Design a protein with these regions (language model features):
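Metal/cofactor-centered catalytic core regions of large enzymes
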Residues: 1-3, 8-255
Length: 255
């Protein structure tokens, strides 16, 4: 689906820039419903097979259980969020605690485990995929018709096809991308529940079209800080499993 929206090269690089001020960059491609329906048929069965294969596998359990333990208190101390926090016994999920973008209209559970080890962090991710499939199915059935972006010309650039037809549209496009739009003076912090935890953005506006200050709170940067605690009194051979269980995005960590 992302390939149809933004092209295969951009999709692979995860730099599709699809979400824009006032909406999204483009409408969903033709046939997207059928593509999602096919995915919803394939993934649950395959995922269940993988889960059954690993859940009672003595080698898998022996390598991951009681390894890299992280307590709830340690998660709080280091700002660990997302599946890693929920694998340590705390049910914090922004989709439930601070609902946004209509997520409160979807039915899903927040899996919680108490062991706090590598096995629990793996297991939480599997359980959350099952819940995500429920959300996707509900979104497919509830998807409304209508515009995919606001029509306020101060925020939204003109359709690209008009750039070859209208000088006014070309000027409008140029001003939007060179000057931007003015934001009222003030500050705000908004966070969402990303696959790895709390992903937030703090922004300060001085009333101009350029932010006075902006900071992105990425989950991987915070989660990986707990690695020394996770690895305390553990052999170096456990490091690979411990890091993988946190599932960090290195681009978020390397600042």
């Amino acid at each position: 689906i992302l390939d149809g929206l933004v092209g295969s090269e951009m999709c692979i690089r995860d730099s599709h820039n699809y979400i824009r001020p006032g909406g999204v960059a483009a409408d969903l491609p033709d046939g997207w419903q059928k593509d999602i329906e096919e995915i919803l048929k394939i993934i649950p069965e395959k995922l269940q097979d993988y889960d059954d294969m690993l859940l009672d596998n003595p080698i898998w359990k022996g390598r991951l259980q009681n390894v890299g333990i992280l307590t709830t208190e340690e998660c709080f101390a280091y700002g660990v969020t997302g599946p890693s926090l929920r694998a340590s016994g705390h049910s914090w999920d922004l989709r439930k605690a601070q609902p946004y973008s209509g997520i409160e209209n979807f039915e899903f559970e927040v899996p919680v485990l108490n062991e706090g080890d590598v096995f629990a962090r793996w297991r939480i991710k599997v359980l959350e995929i099952f819940e995500s499939l429920k959300i996707v199915e509900q979104a497919l059935n509830k998807m409304p018709k209508g515009p995919y972006k606001v029509q306020d010309k101060k925020i939204t650039p003109p359709p690209r096809k008009r750039l070859d037809e209208s000088m006014e549209a070309l000027i409008h496009h140029f001003k939007i991308y060179t000057e931007g739009f003015k934001v009222p003076e003030g500050d705000a912090y908004v966070a969402i529940e990303s696959p790895r935890g709390e992903l937030g953005c703090y922004i300060v506006s001085d009333g101009s079209s350029k932010p006075y200050r902006m900071h992105v709170r990425g989950p991987s940067f915070c989660n990986l800080q707990a690695l020394p605690v996770i690895m305390a009194d553990s052999p170096i051979a456990d490091a690979v499993a411990a890091i993988a269980s946190l599932d960090p995005v290195i681009g978020d960590v390397d600042r």
